[in-house]
Amino acid sequence: MFTAPGMATTQERPYSCSVCGKSFQYSAVLLRHERAHGGDKRFCCLECGERCARAADLRAHRWTHAGQTLYICSECGQSFSHSGLLDLHLGTHRRRSRTRPCRLCGRRFPHVPALLLHRARQHPPEKPHRCPLCARSFRQSALPFHLARAHPPEIITVTAPSPSTLYHCTQCPRAFHSSAGLRNHSRIHVVPSLSDPGTEAHLCGICGKSFSKSSTLTRHLQRHSGEKPFKCPECGKGFLESATLVRHQRTHTGEKPYACSDCGRCFSESSTLLRHQRSHQGERPHVCATCGKGFGQRYDLVVHQRSHTGERPFPCPQCGRGFTDRSDLTKHLRTHTGEKPYHCELCGKRFTCISNLNVHLRNHAGHKPHKCPECGKSFSVASKLALHRKTHLGERTAECTECGKFFSHGRSLSQHQRSHRRARAAAMAATTTTTVVTEVTIGPSLTLTGPTEQEKSGLLVSPFQETC
């Protein structure tokens, strides 16, 4: 992580007020505080002339003119014009409080699902009985069943454990690096035993795969037939298994039962949560062979590699623009249709994607979690903080192609380029000559105009011109 020279840690408060002795972490915060002592009240109310030291104090004062009730946060004293905004703001305090403790280690969590996930991962129930073949652990009652199902002695032979352990098939010379690979392979050697119906295997007549239960074979055959018996009542989409339908229905209900124990973010599927937690652990197992950049999820690596190859497999059917990710295409299509499915319940403003709505809600709640380590200024999104920090570092990466001037923000460059366009338009207006043609009406239906180009050149004689 980037650390600026002389940057204070989260515990240090090196900037002290010379009047009251109060300490601050950032010099910019100290300057704002000292204005209250020095009488520097630069923010003036246009209604009554009242002056305030801070913009926040002026905003609170202006509500008194509007005759609206202020909703004050009992935790920090911040005021809001709407009870819904106060509720959103209070959520930031509730997330910090972490009121749900783990009875085993005392760690506190903001959500019950986060607590349950923590207990499952950090305090799993004891399973003292370890399988000697695959190292899985079980309670006493489950181990014999696992041995009978996963490691049938007539098929599997396991070599002595070593760093290069191989699992050898007793029916053919093939060997495998994992017991699961050997189990999948061993199905091709299993034949139904007519003499022992209890051990009869259920074979798929299409691909030859065998199953221990007829119900499992029936479910497998549905994959070949394309049958999807479980239909979503909302959109009609079909699924092979009921569990897949349950996960799909969460996209309609918005239910997200799996919460991250580190940041409280919720997800609709446990697999998505596990992939998300890699970002907290710093785990990036998927590495780009071209530039060496690491990713926590394989799909993110696939999308990233398209930036090297130039592949854009998702074209827009309206304008032909290509995208590297299907989700980017979905958001782009809304610019053509005008669809904005996500709306703010406080002000009614609508958005094309949920991430923009979340950023908008932070503005309502005054929640700005991204703080500049140099001056203490806070931002609601990380991208705005990154742009802001360029002003401290002196980076100017956006260059004007017309005059060569550099800017730290793309937005500043766009505003600058408008001045070039205005200058060009003014120059064109000044150099363009406009020909004014006057008309003289003679009689009710005869109109006399100025000379045409042909008449000027002498190629055509006007009927109203005398000839010699």
UniProtKB/Swiss-Prot annotation:
One BP term from GO:
regulation of transcription by RNA polymerase II
One Pfam match, given by its short name, reads zf-C2H2
Protein transport among keywords: no
Location of this chain's protein in the cell: Nucleus
ZnF (C2H2-type) intervals: 15-37, 43-65, 71-93, 100-123, 129-151, 167-189, 202-224, 230-252, 258-280, 286-308, 314-336, 342-364, 370-392, 398-420
- Record's keyword terms, sorted: DNA-binding, Metal-binding, Nucleus, Repeat, Transcription, Transcription regulation, Zinc, Zinc-finger
Q: Which domain of life is it from?
A: Eukaryota
Please classify the protein's predominant subcellular localization into one broad category.
nucleus
Q: Name one GO cellular component term.
A: nucleoplasm
Does Metal-binding show up as a keyword for this record? Answer: yes
**What InterPro entries would the database entry show?**
Znf_C2H2_sf, Znf_C2H2_type
GO MF assignments: DNA binding; zinc ion binding
What does this protein do, in the record's words?
May be involved in transcriptional regulation.
The record's family statement is: Belongs to the krueppel C2H2-type zinc-finger protein family.
Protein name, UniProt field:
Zinc finger protein 672
Species source reads Mus musculus (Mouse)
